[in-house]
Amino acid sequence: MKIILSPAKKMITDTDSIEPDALPEFIEKTTEIQSWLKSKSKEELKTIWKCNDKITEQNFNRFENMDLYHLLTPAVLSYEGIAFQYMAPSVFEDMQLEYVQNHLRILSAFYGALKPMDGVTPYRLEMQAKIRIGDAKNLYEYWGDLLYRSVIDDSRIIINLASKEYSKCIEKYLTPQDRYISVTFCEASGDKMVTKGTYAKMARGEMVRFMAENNIENPVDIKKFDRLGYSFRSDLSSDTEYVFERKIEQ
């Protein structure tokens, strides 16, 4: 069973905590993307990154001085977005760290599919970025089925905790033999169920922690998740989607 999760824009370098286990699987393709980005002007990159001058300058300098092989941080410790804050991998016990290393895959526009202990360096690149490398019209074409083939294992089970931007990289290549379960976190708003972005990110990270702490190997056990006010809604769920509702205190 594999769990897929989106990366985060905010990243740090931490070479003091834990040494990475390995380089990312697709480092050669990452090098190709790096070279393409370095060939662009600052203004072109600002358009690609869709950010302000300050963030453009920071990331332009990152790519100018980027070393993909030295002073690396384990991916799960480098990303600092909301989901990763609630996963809190820096306080994982050894068994929990081993669990995520075996089960969690972080999908990245720059690196492809990352194991938690793969060594990375901070970058800025989203899967939807308008990039043409070689014959590929965009990053979805560039990565093709590589991320799917990297993630799928003998169990044929994938738990989707990623955003649509990243889960699309996997969904296009699913086969009838695969069991793909998307997890939806929502709450009642009038007579509708809606997903609130920040709460969903919190819950995704908290669910990874829940699965690691409970060493979950069977998807049915995910239904026991009851943190951050969420509970499983069997009436809204199906074999391919597990829905959790957050109860809002009045």
Features from the language model and the residues they span:
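Internal, well-folded beta-alpha domain core
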Residues: P89-D239, V243-Q250
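Active-site helix-to-loop segments that bind/position phosphate- or nucleotide-bearing substrates
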Residues: I4-V91
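Short hydrophobic beta-strand segments
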Residues: K2-S6, I157-N160
